[in-house]
Amino acid sequence: MKKYFRFVVLLFLPVVCCLLTVATHAQNDSGLVKHKIAIFAPLYLDSAFDQSDEYRYAKNVFPKFINPGLEFYEGSQLALDSLNKDGVPLEIFVYDTRSAKETFEQQLAKPEIQDVSLIIAHCSNNEVRLLSETAARKKIPVINATVPNDAGTVGNPYFIILNPTLRTQCEGIYRYVQKYYSINHIIVFRRKGSADDAIKNLFDEYSKSTMATPLKLRYVDLNENFTGDQLANHLDSNRNNHCIAGSLDINFGRQLTLQLASISKSYPITVIGMPTWDGIKDFSKPEYKGIEIIYSTPFYNSKMDKVSQGISNHFSTKMYARPSDMVFRGYEVTWKFAKLLLKHSKDLASNLGSKQDKVFTDFDIQPVLNKKTLTLDYFENKKLYFLKWQDGIIKSVN
């Protein structure tokens, strides 16, 4: 706990010192044009610190709800530190979207936002629409780094979604199964309800538009307390069974995989899950051995490259902790799009799909067209990695 609290102190102090001021990462040469970037993240500073900047919680307590936004910010800060060492002309504004002093809408209306060239946001579903509207109204590229939601965005070439929408995820899973397992026995296990119906509808819709041979998907609705024996009634012991989890619910996915693993000695099974499975760590446990588990994710980092190792070493030596995936996300998004801004300046919106300045992820940013008007609605990352858990080991399979 002592080491972890030291991590808290080291991490929070820089945020407290710079949040309400403009952190300038630029050379003093007045001839340089300083590109301005606004970063929005849920830092919860007013929840963590009182008016005297004293930590509100006990020294051995660190609320988990603070982690994601703070870790994203820390990654962004590391990227900005690296850019600052290169003397790049950037001016950074950081906003705590959970501030008790001003609303998110008020932050977006601040005078300095009028002049920024790029907005990077670790946002929630409730904030996506405001970000999209701001991007369109001010003609500022906005990077939605976290939420797979377009909030009904139409006709907005300045809005970019890095975490693919459910439609993109379902189409990607369908194509993956179509490419590798089309001749096998394919069952979609699901629950009754509108959430799982949405996934079924997306599969069925893509099945009608695909240029390749459509998959023969068989849908099976499961009750709440289903067993391995009940699943076995829908499997074939003489064929490879590919079972798709037709639900985003993590508990359903975990239970489905566990029950399939329990009968895997009698049935050859591969289970294919949803992007929400990226947060399931149980798959490394012994009870999941014997079954092949595959799921999709837009963000994959093997952490074998020099940049990843440098970030890990920084956290280990300075903070006595391991960097989370959100730290790497913050670093990657800030570095890549800041570099693109420096190269393309006012023409950034036309170069958002550039493959240059890759850090960890092979982003494939493509225009999303309105099916009725065939005009551009927004940009979206279409890249999906497929990862496989087998006997406690995970690796990329595409």
Placement of each model-derived feature along the sequence:
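Periplasmic-binding protein-like
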Residues: E112-S124, V142-A145, H185-R191, R218, ...
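Extracellular/periplasmic periplasmic-binding protein-like sensory domains
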Residues: T257-R329
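Extracytoplasmic ligand/sensor domains, especially the bilobed periplasmic-binding protein
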Residues: I120-F189, G193-F203, G279-K281
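Short beta-strand elements in bilobed, periplasmic/extracellular small-molecule ligand-binding domains
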Residues: N84-S99, K208-E224
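Short, well-structured alpha-helical segments in soluble
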Residues: K101-S117, D229-R239
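Bacterial Sec-dependent N-terminal signal peptides
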Residues: M1-K34, V188, I394-N398
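Segments of small-molecule ligand-sensing domains
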Residues: Y320-S324, A338-I394
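N-terminal extracellular/periplasmic Venus flytrap/periplasmic-binding protein-like
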Residues: Q27-K110
